[in-house]
């Protein structure tokens, strides 16, 4: 099996975790390459639900290497909590099956506090998860962030780095009349957590290089979705990292000479958590039905997801940005009850027709979707195990999506369970 990059083609929550978990069975390693514990992957195995935030989905498999790449911002306390919770549930996690990049920036409590403060300052709130992700990435770009490798330092060297970080954060706190953080206190906290983290730490770029030299199969697991990308998303209602497929090379530390199949995961309808434009949103009984049937609650935020019709304009743009080879279509069963289904094929604003998402947030907020209507199937697809099991109109819907997007559907997820997957085209598995 070739290397595979798995990315979401909407606003996240497409079902990437389940897909990566399923693919992991035939892979040697899985790499998380961006984001932090603001991402959430839900995986169901034999009716038991696992919720992952930082750990790659492969951690639930035996004899698979899970890698947290340099593109991830790492909350060490959240990571240890996640590890401890999985161990309680019988999952074996050790230095042989988990590796953490020495270059990961550290997410600390000061970042979470800063996240909350910055959200208060905004005229229009973004709907951040308040996990400290944005402020940590800001520190990284400003070259003052603490990184995992700093936990190896002697106390006096670490103190100087902490003090440099606090020169900024204490100034911010002062403006909000919040007491400053003492450098010595933060140093002690870091030295306390360090022994739990450091055994997992290695130069991840070298680990991945060695795997490629041995012709091992690697999956690169994206978090969030294309239109939460800091550069290509619906700015400013985006995350703080790049979420599209090319980031796998940067955030994992693998060079471009290694060929990969790029799988785009996409729901049969569209959802979004938090604020920001949503062109096909249904604030009516249709959206309510999608929400209820899809159990659309955010894994991390625990907020209700907004729901709407499938947006082919959004999907086409995402496919181009990541160079998607094939699609994984998820949650088809949520549409089972509709007698007719709509697909957005264009937008309209001020007399102009758009076949892409304009960058202007003002224009985005005023786009009107143009729909094509197709017949529904009013039959149950949940748990279907073969393509032939699907209703005729459900197959027609899938083919319509392929026709519009000009990319084949490789897999269809028919339920939350690990093996609830229909394989249409398996060439990427060879």
Curated annotation (Swiss-Prot):
GO terms for biological process: 'de novo' AMP biosynthetic process; IMP metabolic process. Homodimer. InterPro entries: Adenylosuccin_syn_GTP-bd, Adenylosuccin_syn_Lys_AS, Adenylosuccinate_synth_dom1, Adenylosuccinate_synth_dom2, Adenylosuccinate_synth_dom3, Adenylosuccinate_synthetase, P-loop_NTPase. SUPFAM superfamilies: P-loop containing nucleoside triphosphate hydrolases. IMP binds at residues 13-16, 38-41, 129, 143, 224, 239, 303. Its cofactor is Mg(2+). GTP binds at residues 12-18, 40-42, 305, 331-333, 413-415. It comes from the Bacteria. The gene is purA. HAMAP family: Adenylosucc_synth. CDD domains: AdSS. Pfam families: Adenylsucc_synt (PF00709). Pathway: Purine metabolism; AMP biosynthesis via de novo pathway; AMP from IMP: step 1/2. The active site is at residues 13, 41. Belongs to the adenylosuccinate synthetase family. This is Adenylosuccinate synthetase. Substrate binds at residues 299-305. PROSITE patterns: ADENYLOSUCCIN_SYN_1, ADENYLOSUCCIN_SYN_2. The lineage of its organism: Bacteria, Pseudomonadati, Pseudomonadota, Alphaproteobacteria, Rickettsiales. Its EC number is 6.3.4.4. GO terms for molecular function: adenylosuccinate synthase activity; GTP binding; magnesium ion binding. It is found in: Cytoplasm. It is an enzyme of class 6 (ligase). SMART domains: Adenylsucc_synt. Mg(2+) binds at residues 13, 40. It catalyses: IMP + L-aspartate + GTP = N(6)-(1,2-dicarboxyethyl)-AMP + GDP + phosphate + 2 H(+). Binds 1 Mg(2+) ion per subunit. GO terms for cellular component: cytoplasm.
């Amino acid at each position: 099996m070739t290397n595979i990059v798995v990315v979401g083609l909407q606003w996240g929550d497409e079902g990437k975790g389940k897909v990566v978990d399923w693919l992991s069975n035939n892979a040697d390693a899985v790499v998380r390459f961006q984001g932090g514990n603001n991402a959430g992957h839900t995986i169901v195995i034999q009716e038991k639900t696992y919720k992952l935030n930082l750990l790659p989905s492969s951690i639930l498999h035996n004899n698979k290497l899970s890698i947290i790449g340099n593109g991830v911002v790492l909350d060490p306390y959240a990571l240890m909590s996640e590890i401890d919770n999985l161990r309680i549930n019988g999952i074996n996690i050790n230095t042989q099956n988990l590796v953490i990049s020495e270059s990961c920036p550290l997410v600390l409590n000061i970042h979470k506090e800063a996240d909350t403060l910055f959200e208060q300052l905004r005229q229009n709130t973004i709907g951040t998860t308040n996990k400290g992700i944005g402020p940590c990435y800001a520190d990284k770009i400003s070259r003052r962030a603490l990184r995992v490798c700093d936990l190896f330092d002697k106390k006096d060297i670490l103190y100087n780095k902490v003090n440099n970080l606090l020169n900024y954060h204490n100034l911010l706190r002062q403006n909000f009349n919040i007491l400053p953080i003492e450098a010595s206190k933060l140093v002690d906290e870091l030295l306390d957590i360090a022994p739990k983290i450091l055994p997992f730490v290695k130069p991840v770029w070298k680990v991945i290089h060695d795997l490629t030299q041995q012709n091992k199969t690697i999956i690169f697991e994206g978090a969030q979705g294309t239109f939460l990308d800091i550069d290509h998303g619906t700015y400013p209602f985006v995350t703080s990292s790049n979420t599209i497929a090319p980031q796998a090379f940067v955030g994992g530390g693998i060079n471009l000479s290694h060929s990969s199949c790029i799988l785009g995961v996409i729901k049969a309808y569209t959802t979004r958590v938090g604020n920001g434009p949503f062109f096909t949103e249904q604030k009516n009984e249709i959206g309510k039905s999608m929400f209820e049937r899809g159990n659309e609650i955010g894994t991390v935020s625990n907020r209700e997801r907004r729901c709407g019709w499938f947006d082919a304009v959004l999907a086409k743009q995402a496919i181009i940005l990541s160079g998607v080879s094939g699609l994984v279509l998820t949650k088809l069963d949520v549409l089972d009850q509709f007698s007719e289904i709509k697909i957005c094929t264009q937008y309209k604003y001020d007399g102009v027709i758009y076949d892409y998402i304009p960058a202007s947030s003002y224009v985005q907020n005023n786009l009107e979707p143009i729909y094509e209507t197709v017949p529904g199937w009013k039959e149950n697809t949940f748990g279907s195990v073969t393509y032939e099991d699907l209703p005729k109109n459900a197959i027609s819907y899938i083919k319509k999506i392929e026709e519009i997007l000009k990319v084949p559907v490789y897999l269809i997820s028919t339920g939350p369970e690990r093996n609830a997957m229909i394989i249409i085209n398996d060439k990427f598995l060879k």
